[in-house]
Structure formats: structure tokens, C-alpha cells
Amino acid sequence: IYGWGHKLNETSPLTPRPDLTNQAYTTADGTNYTSDMDAHFPVAADTVINFYAYYPYQASLSNTLASYELKDQIDIMYATPILNKGKMDVQTEANGSTAIVALSFNHQLSAITIVIKKADDIKETLVLQKVELVNYPASVRMDIQTGQLTTSDTKADYPIPVSYTH
């Protein structure tokens, strides 16, 4: 998760909050995510935070562009940004000490699985030798603020592992 703190209605420059910059969040129950860091909402009423989130997490990310190798076949997601969130705007837990910021994630790219089945009326033995995606981008960059993807100019072929059952 990234958090940019700024004055309300200010458009630039937006400075990342050091306590919210690229913090990893983990989950034990698959629903609620927490982090080891301790962040506080600004006290001033005219100071707000923009929240941006992406998956999978990259500890080395230092700007808004996350890079992924497509050969890794991983789900790539970004959250719909939550903009201009101030201390008075957040829902808190019952004791009022923990702010809840609900993020809605969108799939940008997903791992794929291909299943090829022989028709029941074919009696001959068929052997599938190869399945391959040819001439696809080798990598992609995702802007975590917009979800926009940019592919690399480098192309690659992706063999898809074949397992045979009959």
C-alpha cells in the first residue's frame, strides 16, 4: 500500500508518506489485512491521504511503477484508489483506535490454465506435443495509481506445460 499525504484540493506535488510508502500487508483469514507499521492520519482537517495498493507486493518498489515478468504466470492486481481520505472520513473499529480503509482490487492479468480434451468418439491415440503462446511481451509494468499496463518491446514465447491423461 502506498499513501500520499497532501492538502485538500492540492493536485501536485503529492509527497509519499514515509510511514505509508510501499508497506506490505498480510492476512491470516483471507479477508482482513494488517501491517507491522504504525501509521496515523493527519490531525489537520485540510490534510488528507490518497491510498493506492497493488499485488503482488514488491519490496524494492520505489515509485508508482511495478514490473512483472510474464513468464512467472502470476495474478497481477491493483486496487481502485481511495482519494482524499481524512481523519474524519474513515470508519473505525468499535474502540475507535484503528481506521479501516476498504480497498477493492481489480485483476489486471491472471495466470492461465488450458485444458484440451479428446472427444469421446475419437478412438485413436492422440499425442499433444506442445502448447505455446508465441511472440508475447516478456514483461509488463503497472502504474499502481491508475492500473494502466505498459508492455515491454521485448517479445518471448511461453511454453505451457503439458500433462497427458486419457
Q: What kind of region is each of these model predictions?
A:
Residues I1-V127:
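Short, low-hydrophobicity acidic/polar segments
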Residues I1-H6, I122-D153:
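Short, ordered, surface-exposed loop/turn motifs in non-cytosolic proteins
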Residues T165-H166:
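Conserved small/polar residues in nucleotide/adenosyl-binding loops
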